């Protein structure tokens, strides 16, 4: 439960340049079988991307800021997050109506981050976009993308590791990786993809939305992610299944995408 005795989960979504997507996501969150508190972090750069008033009225909480920190914007109001769990939703997908319920039903007693789209390093330690196959049980992963279900009281680790790695001045942090790495390095908590479920309403990406302005389309996107993983490794992090690390100059292994 929240500190005020309300819902156990706070669902957070960023509005930057996809207000139509955010409006749809807010509606999908309001239809959840287990209703979360809905929070919008509104950091749109100009009037073209502002949210309609009816969407803002449907949210329980709205935080407005003018400095863009990329996906790290979701962590700026972390001092105000006061529910037992926080679900961070990317703004390019719609969850099914039982998505929050699914996370609550499948969470282990101790965990750092839960999600449904996970990544592990390749066998040679290089970065891969290949998704971890979900099975009938929780599967450990190195990090998750696009949606993150976390124990709120542990979120302080994100900024702690950001300072330790010297990323406090970085305008766009690889925040998905930072979240999982911080949970493991600071609290010893693992990240998992949840068990596969044949109910489409349990999916965090039941419907895919337009993904214009996506950070993944940056020309240096994978170089930045590899660079972050090197920093994490230097800080003591290792892959969830003890993989090695590529030698210098071996990062450009051909990447394959499997959904």
Regions found by a protein language model. Give the residues of each.
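A short, glycine-/small-residue-rich helix N-cap motif at loop->alpha-helix starts
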Residues: 65-73, 172-173
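C-terminal catalytic/acceptor-binding lobe
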Residues: 6, 20-25, 164-259
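Conserved catalytic core of nucleotide-sugar-dependent glycosyltransferases
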Residues: 78, 94-166
């Amino acid at each position: 439960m929240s500190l005020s005795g309300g819902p156990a989960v706070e669902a957070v979504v960023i509005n930057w340049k996809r207000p139509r997507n955010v409006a749809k996501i807010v509606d999908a969150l309001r239809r959840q079988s287990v209703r979360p508190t809905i929070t919008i972090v509104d950091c749109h750069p100009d009037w073209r991307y502002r949210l309609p008033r009816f969407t803002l009225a449907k949210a329980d909480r709205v935080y407005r800021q003018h400095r863009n920190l990329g996906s790290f914007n979701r962590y700026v109001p972390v001092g105000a997050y006061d529910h037992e769990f926080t679900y961070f939703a990317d703004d390019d997908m719609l969850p099914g109506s039982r998505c929050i319920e699914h996370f609550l039903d499948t969470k282990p007693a101790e965990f750092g981050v839960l999600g449904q789209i996970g990544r592990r390093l390749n066998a040679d330690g290089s970065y891969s976009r290949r998704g971890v196959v979900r099975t009938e049980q929780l599967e450990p992963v190195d990090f998750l993308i696009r949606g993150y279900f976390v124990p709120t009281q542990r979120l302080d680790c994100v900024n702690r590791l950001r300072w330790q790695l010297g990323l406090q001045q970085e305008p766009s942090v690889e925040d998905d990786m930072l979240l999982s790495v911080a949970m493991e390095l600071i609290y010893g908590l693992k990240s998992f993809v949840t068990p596969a479920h044949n109910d489409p309403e349990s999916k965090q990406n039941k419907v895919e939305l337009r993904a214009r302005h996506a950070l993944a389309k940056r020309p240096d996107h994978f170089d930045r992610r590899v660079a972050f993983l090197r920093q994490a490794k230097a800080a003591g992090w290792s892959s969830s299944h003890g993989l090695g690390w590529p030698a210098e100059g071996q990062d450009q292994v051909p990447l394959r995408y499997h959904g």
